[in-house]
Amino acid sequence: MKQSANATAKRSRTVVVLAIAVVLILLGSILAQTFNTSFYNVKVSRISFETDSGTLSGLLYLPKNVDASTPHPAIVTTHGYLNSAEMQDETAIEMSRRGYVVLALDMYDHGHSRGNAENTGGFFNFWPTSLWDAAQYMYQQDYVAKDAQGNGQIAVSGHSMGGFSSEMALYLDETNYASTGYRII
């Protein structure tokens, strides 16, 4: 009888500890979401869009006061090799808190993005156009600011391999400028 009382008490303690752990996990998740959205001043959503080279996806950080009537400058940022958009969370949160529209991008064949092999090239050729394609997408959004001449107010940023993609995006933007007369980036 004494052994069964000890087993019951032990089981009760286990249930209490488990319940406390679940409550702490839920509170931690709510707190993390609160910080991730800058105390709900930034809407964070996963978006995806089609390009000639495949499907790009990323996390869009949209400050609360941004819409077509009040467009804001944008920043497209991307990760290094073997990473995904979530790697840029801290940077994206800080930039969006300061009023920038931020797209933290998954490059082709990373995270939720998929490239078409015939359009992105062969092995390891996913990075040259990822950021450029995303900048073109952001330029088309009515909540992204443009100057009086139609130039986009979009910055690009990347970590490691994403830095190479940023350089390539700037090169492609200059090539585009030569034929269109306006800059996207």
Map each language-model feature to its residues:
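N-terminal cap/lid segment of alpha/beta-hydrolase-fold proteins
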Residues: 30-70
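Short beta-strand element of the alpha/beta-hydrolase
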Residues: 69-80
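The serine-hydrolase catalytic nucleophile loop
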Residues: 82-93, 107
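Alpha/beta-hydrolase active-site loop
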Residues: 87, 121-145
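Conserved alpha/beta-hydrolase
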Residues: 96-114
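Alpha/beta-hydrolase fold nucleophile elbow
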Residues: 144-160
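Short glycine-enriched nucleophile-adjacent loop
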Residues: 163-176
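A conserved short beta-strand
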Residues: 176-185
